[in-house]
């Protein structure tokens, strides 16, 4: 049977095809141990449909989004996720983007705040029945 992991893998492959320039991996011990990715838009917050409809990605959009940040369990708590966020922020700045935006669950807010992002409040997202928060940083 197909698990949530299979659905997620298909989404990641779609994203890699739609915006390969916005897909960054972390490599350690000669293996991929994490990644960060996201499309670009002109919207200041991230609507749910952006996750599911890759055609909403605008390569020339002024705002960089984060769709996914993941580090495999055995490499977590080693600073890899933070390095990916910082690298992605710098990449967005270098490309002339005006901001970086994302949605996250409550327990991740302190992590993103430690990387300069501001919490805007509860997001409109209802993905997975969870409560999500809009986060952003303007450059």
Regions found by a protein language model. Give the residues of each.
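Conserved beta-hairpin
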Residues: 22-36
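Conserved acyl-donor/pantetheine-binding loop and adjacent beta-alpha core of acyl/acetyltransferases
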Residues: 35-70, 76, 86, 126-132
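Short, small-residue-biased leader/transition segments that mark boundaries at the very start
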Residues: 3-8
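Conserved G/P- and acidic residue-centered "switch" motifs that form tight phosphate/ATP-binding loops
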Residues: 79
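Conserved GNAT acetyl-CoA-binding A-motif
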Residues: 85, 91-105
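Short loop/turn motifs at secondary-structure junctions and domain boundaries
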Residues: 14-20
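Conserved acetyl-CoA-binding loop of GNAT-fold acetyltransferases
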Residues: 113-123
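C-terminal "cap" of GNAT-fold acetyltransferases
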Residues: 105-106, 121-139
